[in-house]
Amino acid sequence: MARYTDAVCRLCRREGLKLYLKGERCYTDKCAITKRNFAPGQHGTSRKKLSNYGVQLREKQKAKRFYGVLESQFRKYFDMADKQAGNTGENLLRILETRLDNLVYRLGLASSRAEARQLVVHGHFTVNGGKVDIPSYLVKAGDAVAVSEKSTNSPKFKELKENFKGTVPTWLTVDSEKLEGKVAAMPSREDIDLPISENLIVELYSK
């Protein structure tokens, strides 16, 4: 499974906004974009005016980086979204939101999507009672996601249970005592709070 392995703070600086890729650090003064709010590289301090194509490309890159998805997987999701009824851009965001790693993050069971992905891969979560270790697994309305019984006794999740402070989107419910959550409904566009202009991504792929 291919993954981005360079310093993730460079991605935030490239996009010019916080992508919240490093969990708690992103909320402190240690955040790289707080210290150096310009693109990485020799000419990073001078941002050039982008063409229409450049604007569309940056929007796609931003969405990919928020969710930690590489190009081949992202294109697959777009093709899925395009075949569904309704607005293609909104369908795309809905698919991305229902990835298991994103759900673990949204439920407050991980401090970042990257950490959530790692925890899923290591087998710490179940979906409807069965272990799932695939971060890209797509959940559905009614699915229950929980920390596995074996993992609830680990120091990581004991601490999380004692200090749980997550707030979840309206399409999810969470039981912090049991360390489990449920997909109450599929997310609408209004439920997705990321600064993404999905119509620009649709325009890019429609060329």
UniProtKB/Swiss-Prot annotation:
Residue ranges occupied by any S4 RNA-binding domain in the UniProt entry: 98-163
Key words of the record: Ribonucleoprotein, Ribosomal protein, RNA-binding, rRNA-binding
Superkingdom field: Bacteria
SUPFAM superfamilies named in the record: Alpha-L RNA-binding motif
GO cellular component: small ribosomal subunit
Pfam family for this entry, one: Ribosomal_S4
Protein name in UniProt: Small ribosomal subunit protein uS4A
Family according to the record: Belongs to the universal ribosomal protein uS4 family.
UniProt entry tagged with the keyword rRNA-binding: yes
Gene Ontology molecular function: any one: structural constituent of ribosome
Species of origin: Alkaliphilus metalliredigens (strain QYMF)
